[in-house]
Curated annotation (Swiss-Prot):
It comes from the Eukaryota. It comes from Cyanidium caldarium (Red alga). The keyword Ribonucleoprotein applies. Keywords: Chloroplast, Plastid, Ribonucleoprotein, Ribosomal protein, RNA-binding, rRNA-binding. One of its GO terms (biological process) is translation. One of the primary rRNA binding proteins, it binds directly to 16S rRNA where it nucleates assembly of the body of the 30S subunit. This is Small ribosomal subunit protein uS4c-1. Its main location: plastid. Part of the 30S ribosomal subunit. Contacts protein S5. The interaction surface between S4 and S5 is involved in control of translational fidelity.
Amino acid sequence: MSRYTGPKIRIIRRLGELPALTTKKVKNNYPPGREWSTNEELSEYAIRLQEKQKIRFNYGINEKQLRRYVKKAKKSRGSTGSYLLNLLEMRLDNIVLRAGLAPTIAASRQLVSHKHIEVNNKIVNIPSFQCSIGDTIHVKKSNKSRQLIDLNSRRDTTKFFPKYLEVNKDNMGARVVKTMDKQDVNLTINELLVVEFYSRKG
Protein backbone atom coordinates (compact mmCIF):
# COMPACT_ATOMS: atom_id res chain seq x y z
CA MET A 1 0.00 0.00 0.00
CA SER A 2 1.47 3.34 -1.08
CA ARG A 3 1.32 6.65 0.74
CA TYR A 4 -2.01 8.48 0.66
CA THR A 5 -2.04 11.56 -1.60
CA GLY A 6 -5.76 12.35 -1.60
CA PRO A 7 -7.77 14.98 0.32
CA LYS A 8 -6.36 15.28 3.83
CA ILE A 9 -9.52 16.72 5.38
CA ARG A 10 -11.36 13.46 4.64
CA ILE A 11 -8.74 11.57 6.63
CA ILE A 12 -9.00 13.93 9.61
CA ARG A 13 -12.78 13.70 9.63
CA ARG A 14 -12.48 9.92 9.74
CA LEU A 15 -9.60 9.52 12.20
CA GLY A 16 -9.50 12.75 14.21
CA GLU A 17 -6.74 15.34 14.53
CA LEU A 18 -3.44 14.38 12.88
CA PRO A 19 -1.04 17.29 13.56
CA ALA A 20 1.66 16.16 11.13
CA LEU A 21 -0.67 15.51 8.20
CA THR A 22 -2.05 19.00 7.66
CA THR A 23 -2.35 22.40 9.33
CA LYS A 24 -5.96 22.72 8.14
CA LYS A 25 -8.81 22.54 10.64
CA VAL A 26 -11.94 20.46 10.28
CA LYS A 27 -15.31 22.22 10.36
CA ASN A 28 -17.39 19.04 10.50
CA ASN A 29 -16.60 16.31 13.01
CA TYR A 30 -18.55 13.54 11.30
CA PRO A 31 -16.99 11.04 8.88
CA PRO A 32 -17.06 11.78 5.12
CA GLY A 33 -20.25 10.69 3.40
CA ARG A 34 -22.42 11.33 6.47
CA GLU A 35 -24.48 14.43 7.16
CA TRP A 36 -24.44 14.11 10.92
CA SER A 37 -22.58 12.43 13.72
CA THR A 38 -23.75 9.01 14.88
CA ASN A 39 -23.14 6.92 17.96
CA GLU A 40 -22.26 3.88 15.89
CA GLU A 41 -20.21 1.47 17.97
CA LEU A 42 -17.03 0.29 16.29
CA SER A 43 -15.90 -3.31 16.45
CA GLU A 44 -12.64 -4.16 18.21
CA TYR A 45 -11.04 -4.78 14.83
CA ALA A 46 -12.24 -1.41 13.52
CA ILE A 47 -10.77 0.36 16.56
CA ARG A 48 -7.40 -1.34 16.10
CA LEU A 49 -7.47 -0.53 12.39
CA GLN A 50 -8.28 3.10 13.16
CA GLU A 51 -5.30 3.43 15.51
CA LYS A 52 -3.05 1.84 12.91
CA GLN A 53 -4.24 4.29 10.27
CA LYS A 54 -3.61 7.23 12.60
CA ILE A 55 0.06 6.31 12.82
CA ARG A 56 0.36 5.71 9.09
CA PHE A 57 -1.10 9.05 8.07
CA ASN A 58 0.45 11.14 10.83
CA TYR A 59 3.98 9.88 10.18
CA GLY A 60 3.50 9.66 6.43
CA ILE A 61 4.54 6.03 6.08
CA ASN A 62 3.10 3.19 4.05
CA GLU A 63 1.79 -0.17 5.20
CA LYS A 64 5.01 -2.02 4.47
CA GLN A 65 7.07 0.47 6.48
CA LEU A 66 4.76 0.35 9.49
CA ARG A 67 4.71 -3.44 9.47
CA ARG A 68 8.51 -3.42 9.45
CA TYR A 69 8.64 -0.96 12.38
CA VAL A 70 6.25 -3.12 14.42
CA LYS A 71 8.29 -6.23 13.67
CA LYS A 72 11.46 -4.46 14.82
CA ALA A 73 9.74 -3.13 17.95
CA LYS A 74 8.65 -6.65 18.94
CA LYS A 75 12.29 -7.73 19.03
CA SER A 76 13.24 -4.96 21.44
CA ARG A 77 13.49 -5.19 25.21
CA GLY A 78 10.85 -3.39 27.22
CA SER A 79 7.56 -2.01 25.94
CA THR A 80 6.90 -2.84 22.29
CA GLY A 81 4.52 0.10 21.95
CA SER A 82 6.97 2.61 23.39
CA TYR A 83 9.77 1.36 21.17
CA LEU A 84 7.49 1.62 18.14
CA LEU A 85 6.74 5.26 18.90
CA ASN A 86 10.43 5.94 19.47
CA LEU A 87 11.30 4.53 16.04
CA LEU A 88 8.71 6.78 14.44
CA GLU A 89 9.63 9.90 16.40
CA MET A 90 13.33 9.45 15.58
CA ARG A 91 12.77 9.42 11.83
CA LEU A 92 14.64 12.34 10.28
CA ASP A 93 11.56 13.71 8.53
CA ASN A 94 9.69 13.73 11.85
CA ILE A 95 12.59 15.43 13.66
CA VAL A 96 12.65 18.18 11.02
CA LEU A 97 8.91 18.63 11.49
CA ARG A 98 9.01 18.64 15.30
CA ALA A 99 11.87 21.17 15.25
CA GLY A 100 9.53 23.59 13.48
CA LEU A 101 11.39 23.55 10.17
CA ALA A 102 8.40 22.34 8.13
CA PRO A 103 4.60 22.71 8.44
CA THR A 104 3.70 19.09 7.62
CA ILE A 105 5.34 15.68 7.40
CA ALA A 106 5.06 15.78 3.59
CA ALA A 107 6.87 19.13 3.46
CA SER A 108 9.48 17.81 5.86
CA ARG A 109 10.08 14.72 3.73
CA GLN A 110 10.54 16.94 0.69
CA LEU A 111 13.15 19.07 2.48
CA VAL A 112 15.11 15.97 3.39
CA SER A 113 14.80 14.35 -0.05
CA HIS A 114 15.95 17.54 -1.78
CA LYS A 115 19.11 17.66 0.34
CA HIS A 116 18.31 20.73 2.43
CA ILE A 117 19.01 18.96 5.75
CA GLU A 118 22.28 17.96 7.42
CA VAL A 119 22.79 15.47 10.25
CA ASN A 120 26.06 15.95 12.13
CA ASN A 121 27.24 18.31 9.35
CA LYS A 122 26.63 15.78 6.58
CA ILE A 123 23.74 15.93 4.11
CA VAL A 124 21.23 13.13 4.61
CA ASN A 125 18.48 12.76 2.02
CA ILE A 126 16.73 9.69 3.46
CA PRO A 127 13.50 10.66 5.31
CA SER A 128 13.46 7.37 7.26
CA PHE A 129 17.00 7.89 8.59
CA GLN A 130 17.01 7.04 12.31
CA CYS A 131 18.36 9.83 14.50
CA SER A 132 19.99 9.07 17.86
CA ILE A 133 20.77 10.90 21.09
CA GLY A 134 23.54 13.41 20.40
CA ASP A 135 22.71 13.90 16.72
CA THR A 136 22.49 17.49 15.49
CA ILE A 137 20.09 18.36 12.70
CA HIS A 138 20.58 21.60 10.77
CA VAL A 139 19.46 23.29 7.60
CA LYS A 140 22.15 23.26 4.95
CA LYS A 141 24.12 26.52 4.88
CA SER A 142 22.94 27.75 1.49
CA ASN A 143 20.77 30.75 0.69
CA LYS A 144 18.17 28.60 -1.08
CA SER A 145 17.81 26.18 1.82
CA ARG A 146 17.73 28.89 4.48
CA GLN A 147 15.18 30.99 2.62
CA LEU A 148 12.95 27.97 2.18
CA ILE A 149 13.11 27.08 5.88
CA ASP A 150 12.57 30.71 6.88
CA LEU A 151 9.32 30.68 4.92
CA ASN A 152 8.24 27.47 6.66
CA SER A 153 9.18 28.72 10.14
CA ARG A 154 6.84 31.67 9.84
CA ARG A 155 3.86 29.33 9.64
CA ASP A 156 2.14 27.68 12.57
CA THR A 157 4.34 24.60 12.32
CA THR A 158 4.15 23.16 15.83
CA LYS A 159 2.37 23.87 19.10
CA PHE A 160 5.23 22.70 21.27
CA PHE A 161 8.74 21.32 20.97
CA PRO A 162 9.24 17.81 22.36
CA LYS A 163 11.53 17.54 25.37
CA TYR A 164 13.82 15.15 23.52
CA LEU A 165 14.84 18.03 21.23
CA GLU A 166 16.96 21.07 22.00
CA VAL A 167 15.83 23.52 19.34
CA ASN A 168 17.87 26.49 18.13
CA LYS A 169 15.58 28.66 16.03
CA ASP A 170 18.26 31.22 15.18
CA ASN A 171 20.58 28.51 13.88
CA MET A 172 17.73 26.64 12.16
CA GLY A 173 18.56 23.37 13.84
CA ALA A 174 18.02 21.00 16.73
CA ARG A 175 19.82 18.37 18.78
CA VAL A 176 18.45 15.10 20.11
CA VAL A 177 19.18 15.29 23.84
CA LYS A 178 17.23 12.44 25.44
CA THR A 179 15.03 9.43 24.93
CA MET A 180 11.47 10.10 23.86
CA ASP A 181 8.60 9.99 26.38
CA LYS A 182 4.98 9.26 25.46
CA GLN A 183 4.12 12.85 26.44
CA ASP A 184 6.39 14.07 23.64
CA VAL A 185 4.21 12.50 20.96
CA ASN A 186 2.00 15.13 19.36
CA LEU A 187 -0.75 12.63 18.61
CA THR A 188 -3.54 10.96 20.56
CA ILE A 189 -2.81 7.30 19.95
CA ASN A 190 -3.07 3.89 21.61
CA GLU A 191 0.10 2.31 20.27
CA LEU A 192 -0.63 -1.03 21.96
CA LEU A 193 -3.67 -1.47 19.74
CA VAL A 194 -1.43 -0.99 16.72
CA VAL A 195 0.90 -3.73 17.92
CA GLU A 196 -2.11 -5.93 18.63
CA PHE A 197 -3.49 -5.28 15.13
CA TYR A 198 -0.41 -6.82 13.52
CA SER A 199 -0.12 -9.58 16.12
CA ARG A 200 -3.61 -10.78 15.29
CA LYS A 201 -2.89 -10.65 11.56
CA GLY A 202 0.12 -12.89 12.09
